[in-house]
């Protein structure tokens, strides 16, 4: 994921943030462009953060990135993109990997950056609505321990001790002999590579 600061730090500087560590411990601070702009406005124009850049894409008339006041509803933001092109849309707040399903009455907050307008039957909507208990049963039935999920895990690739395939084996078999397998899942960045792309 391009927005994962731990991966970004490695790609730009070659430094690896230790598992569970903070970027500043590696002598690095990561800010996005909008944050830097907001700091500049606060310091030079004495303007607090009262608006947000939001991209509205997918099933809309005119995909657009707009600056809207914080507190604007998602439906109002989607209207600025010409409205939806599907009946009964699902508003997916954030990106496809780490986003969540929101509602039209939900307000834009300081962390809102994108709205994906999707149909009810879209794969991302189905994935977010699925129950974790069903996901675990499905994984237990089909996981062949190929370790592709671990091979593609961005945190594992940086040397962090997370191994999704071993977690799946331990979780589905209810094997608690090696507690570190479970503890190491705290280093997961929730990007979804293991479940959405590798498996």
Locate predicted features.
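Hydrophobic alpha-helical positions that pack around
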Residues: 1-74, 80-87, 95
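Structured core elements
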Residues: 55, 65-67, 76, 92, ...
